[in-house]
Amino acid sequence: VLMRLVGMRPVVVHGGGPQITALMERLGKKSEFVNGLRVTDAETVEIARMVLKGEVNPQLVAAINVHGNYAVGVSGVDGGLIRAEARDPELGFVGDVTEINPEVINGLLDDEFIPVIATIGSDETGQAYNINADTAAGAIAEALGAEKLIYLTDIEGLRRDVADAATLIRRTTADELDALVADGIIAGGMIPKIDSCTHAVRNGVKGGHILDGRVAHVLLLELFTDDGIGTMIENTGTEQMGTRP
């Protein structure tokens, strides 16, 4: 809300992995992941849709609206916001983004609302797909020509050694991250986040940030201080290098 009040146009994109897993467990269904992506059969995609649109999205909207009635919840299905196709038959109904309809988002932004987007997309037949929230966020940032792509997670940022807080990477480039993935330093569920972020900064988004969403005022500390508090990712080269803002 503060970002909106100071003239920014924030867009919130969310998943709901832990909540989906919890409901699947209650239903006696096992979760399976491949390279950080949830294998999604027909039943699982319906569970994902129910959790994202029926639980997580309205909770986030309500939390924002405590501070003013600014947030509006939508899903990628609404207005053809996120068009998708199957990524890999072995993953089932896991979608790759094929197209973003920015008019849906820009319409809300122009009316001074904060869009809160659940990452369920659909193809032209109406088939729903579970889309990794990091992947969707990157595609949306590119489509909007966003200045920043910010990931709030449960780690302080990227580390060269996950067990050593002193190895936190404060600033890096897309090429350097490619090398860290190739060397196996970045793995698992972090891969979709890094892939989408590097793609975004190579396609017009000026900076990506990986932050610990559990830290109070983390966005202000990252964006409005020279050193920041997490990891900042930019395109290769020094022409974009500067202070955090």
Could you say what each language-model-derived stretch is?
Residues 1-214, 221-223, 227, 235-245:
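Nucleotide/pyrophosphate-binding catalytic subdomain
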